[in-house]
């Protein structure tokens, strides 16, 4: 948001979710469901509109950037793939925190593995389809120097309200990350305190 002071805004977000955590795991989980649902809806709209609209995904644009392995040797393709993996890995960091909250989940032996597999599957589908639409809409040369690739692409096939939608989606993505990270951190602190690794004060419960 132009003109918004970064540090005060960040502090406000942290305090907001810290206060939310004081109301218990159920409130935190419900907030995550709502925020995640809004974020998923925005991505679904982005992908569908990008593939359907004439000004959206174009195979010619996608191929022009050589974004898939075309006319390269095996070693060249392998080198490109490994270089990409190093970057893509960070996008998947976070699914492991599901296990941190195992004690808050009913039937964790069944639901935790399902949650991890389902989250990885959904994340992979979203990342692949969003990347296809983005790289097939805007030439990679334009995206290379951009810090707002999705908003650059969405204005081609959802003019008007597309850019605000993706801007809000970006902010919500940050909020979901903060919310899940804070829940995971509190559970880790509680467990470490209970096991005697950290001071026992961290294992005390209000009720």
Residue locations for each model-derived region?
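Hydrophobic transmembrane alpha-helices that form the core helical bundles
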Residues: 1-22, 27, 166-191
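Membrane-interface loop-to-helix entry segments
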Residues: 7-62, 116-120
């Amino acid at each position: 948001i132009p003109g918004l002071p970064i540090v005060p805004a960040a502090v406000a977000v942290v305090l907001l979710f810290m206060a939310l955590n004081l109301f218990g795991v159920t409130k935190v989980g419900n907030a995550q469901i709502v925020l995640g649902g809004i974020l998923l809806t925005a991505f679904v709209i982005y992908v569908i509109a990008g593939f359907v609209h004439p000004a959206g995904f174009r195979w010619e644009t996608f191929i022009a950037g050589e974004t898939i392995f075309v006319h390269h040797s095996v070693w060249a393709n392998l080198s490109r793939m490994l270089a990409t993996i190093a970057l893509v890995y960070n996008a998947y960091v976070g699914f492991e925190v599901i296990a941190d909250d195992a004690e808050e989940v009913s039937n964790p032996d069944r639901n935790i593995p399902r949650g991890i597999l389902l989250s990885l599957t959904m994340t992979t589908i979203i990342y692949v389809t969003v990347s296809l639409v983005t790289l097939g809409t805007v030439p990679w040369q334009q995206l290379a120097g951009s810090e707002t690739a999705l908003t650059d692409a969405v204005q081609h096939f959802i003019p008007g309200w597309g850019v605000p939608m993706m801007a809000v989606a970006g902010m919500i993505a940050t909020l979901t990350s903060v919310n899940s990270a804070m829940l995971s951190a509190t559970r880790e602190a509680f467990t470490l305190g209970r096991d005697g690794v950290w001071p026992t004060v961290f294992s005390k419960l209000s009720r």
